[in-house]
Amino acid sequence: MDIPPLAGRTVAMSFCALPVSYLLNQVSAFSQPLFVVLTSALILGLLFLAVYSLSHGEITYDPLYAVFVIFSFTSVVDLVIALQEDGYMMGFMDFYTKEGEPYLRTAHGIFICYWDGTVHYLLYLTMAGAIRKRKRYRNLGLYWLGSFAMSILVFLPGNILGKYSSEMRPTFFLAILYMLVPCWAGVRIFNQSRAPTSYTPDMVQEEQKKSLLQRPADLALIVYLIFAALFTVFRGLVVLDCPTDACFIYIYQYEPYLRDPVAYPKLQMLMYLFYALPFYCLAAYALAFPGCSWLPDWALVFAGAIGQAQFSHMGASMHMRTPFTYRVPEDTWATFFLSNLLLALGPHLLAFRCLWRPAFFLHAALPSSPQDQDKKQQ
């Protein structure tokens, strides 16, 4: 997709986060958690009014435009937080990480901020530009939906269940409202019409007649999905304290981060066990049997979710904020990195396959009879 002309205006509004955060950081009143949450709500409200007044036509055409522009602002804030916590910036968001959301200072929180400040930010700019030019952005929206939902579903419960549960601030309840956004946005994105395809019914039937051996890419993906499902079950058993020797060796020698009391890694593995595992099985079925029209959409959602999850999990496992005893040992770093990288790349290859040649997943229409063709010609 080409870079839309609106990107410049959206970038300008989002980068207002830099002077705003710097000025707020200099005000001593923001050492109180209540002031932090009230100011955060006020800034978001003023930003919405500014977007509404400047881009009323775009919001009328698609209300998600306002969401993408506002979230591009928060993405810059998250990137500033991540860079500051890693020592690349100073004096911008100290007040927020101390009195707003201290759990953003964890390794997992830092990598969530990096993902939001880069991948999500680019998605917001592109989708806002697509709305401006009245173009489709359904595929990008589905990817963002999965990524955003996964980050929220792991991060918010992890804040409650982990060692930072005693440091909850009023800002946490403002973050809970974020859970409503993917629900509303997901309904709107799924209700958008799909991009038209050029496949005729005869082409669809011809593609769906092919056996699995005639589709080596699908066969390879099914093999991958089987191994990914087995690995997901294994890591789920590991975090559930399975007493077998294999689980004991794995959690101490390969992924000790799963024992970290911050609770994010354990919740991540449980999300995989209860949600990713069923998808692996259903996706393998959809690749073997034709006509599963749901797979292309959900493959995009799943790719976004796994991409965000694996980025945060892999980064936090090796970050300096993670205690040394919970970091990946140097002698098993290659095994850890390769296995988790494959787990992240596989869903993206599946989504690419579904978008590349979707005929296998379309509903096959019955071929028209000669009598019907004669009627059409008459």
UniProtKB/Swiss-Prot annotation:
Subcellular location: Endoplasmic reticulum membrane; Endoplasmic reticulum-Golgi intermediate compartment membrane
Expression across tissues: Highly expressed in the liver at both the mRNA and protein levels.
Boundaries of every EXPERA domain copy: 61-186, 217-351
Stretches that traverse the bilayer: 10-30, 34-54, 63-83, 110-130, 140-160, 170-190, 219-239, 269-289, 291-311, 332-352
Keyword Metal-binding belongs to the record: no
Superkingdom: Eukaryota
Membrane topology per record: Multi-pass membrane protein
Alphabetical UniProt keywords: Endoplasmic reticulum, Membrane, Repeat, Transmembrane, Transmembrane helix
UniProt keyword annotation of DNA repair present: no
GO biological process annotation, one example: regulation of lipid metabolic process
Pfam families according to UniProt: EBP (PF05241)
Cellular component GO terms, alphabetical: endoplasmic reticulum membrane; endoplasmic reticulum-Golgi intermediate compartment membrane
Primary location recorded for the protein, binned into one broad class: endoplasmic reticulum
UniProt similarity note: Belongs to the TM6SF family.
Function summary: Regulator of liver fat metabolism influencing triglyceride secretion and hepatic lipid droplet content. May function as sterol isomerase.
Protein name per its UniProtKB record: Transmembrane 6 superfamily member 2
Organism taxonomic ancestry: Eukaryota, Metazoa, Chordata, Craniata, Vertebrata
